Amino acid sequence: MKLLTFAIPSYNSQDYMEHCILSLLPGGDDVEILIVDDGSKDRTAEIADEYERKYPGIVRAIHQENGGHGEAVNAGIRNATGLFFKVVDSDDWVDYEAYMKILKKLRELAGGDTVLDMFIANYVYEKEGVRHKKIMRYSSLPQDKIFTWNEAGRFHKGQYILMHSVIYRTQLLRECGLELPKHTFYVDNIYVYKPLPSVKHMYYMDVDFYRYFIGRDDQSVNERVMIGRIDQQIKVNKIMIDEFDLWKIQNPKLRHYMFNYLEIITVISTIMLIRSGTEENLEKKRELWKYIKDHDIRLFHHLRNGIMGNAMNLPGRGGRKISVAAYKLSQKIVGFN
């Protein structure tokens, strides 16, 4: 069995995927690199096959009809032989020194008595034109030791475990029934959210591992693109609302974190609907909040009466301007767009 499987969802990625693949190859025989060609129209499939030929036993090319990012991740989970699993998008990469430290620690943890469910490391926003890179650290978590939710501190606003920071135990992803929707953007939020109640033991290493590239005009986190795909953001938001009755999550720290995560996703949905400026999207905003209210009145009041919820729901044009100002401030803090 391999120690760590990397899945690289790849769609028309010929211009940048090799940088990603090359950053993962130093893992050698400890790792498995699954390049999932999601029905690409360019040379992505050819490049994937070329690396499979060059690095047999390490790189595998998987070809499928286009199913979107979520189905590419699903294919990775289905085909993974590693004890642990990580998604690396084809325009991102990893830092060599942090990578070597993580592999060494995973080897140690794999041979221990405690089953590790989730490994967390920092990620860096590699934003074009920005000299000082924002690093997402997790100061509320114990460092360099296995811990449980009981030992975790409270996450600050703007501190979220994203796909970029997490390595899951592969079997946990299968056992929790994770199946991401096809042809849908923003499913990475479901990827990190759904397994959380199944996570018992975690480990955090304060190293800047994952390099998250931001800057392509067609990127899904580009604000203009997000507004154009707002129906998919709302779909993901509703799936997350439906997934759990958060009031039944027994561990208070896990419950608090999951409320915060659902809150920021709902804030992003709401503010994109406001920023679009169309009456149709303002109606979708009202419908989203009605959906939450009809689904769980306590959840509605919890989200609505928080600082973010209040800022997002101030009435009239003046209220919408304040909402946008609050969003711009949170954007600088969180760096989610």
Regions found by a protein language model. Name each.
Residues 12-26:
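Short, well-formed alpha-helical segments that are part of the catalytic scaffolds
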Residues 23, 37-46, 68:
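A conserved acidic beta->alpha catalytic loop
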Residues 30-39, 60-65, 89-90:
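Short beta-strand/loop segment that forms part of the nucleotide-sugar
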Residues 64-80:
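Glycine-rich, basic loop-to-helix element that forms the pyrophosphate-binding segment
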Residues 69, 93-202, 218-226:
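Donor-binding/catalytic cores of nucleotide-activated saccharide
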Residues 85:
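Short aromatic/hydrophobic "clamp" motif used to bind/position activated sugar donors
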Residues 184, 198-236, 276-283:
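Nucleotide-sugar-dependent glycosyltransferase catalytic core
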Residues 275-337:
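Membrane-interface aromatic/basic loop that binds lipid-linked glycans or pyrophosphate carriers
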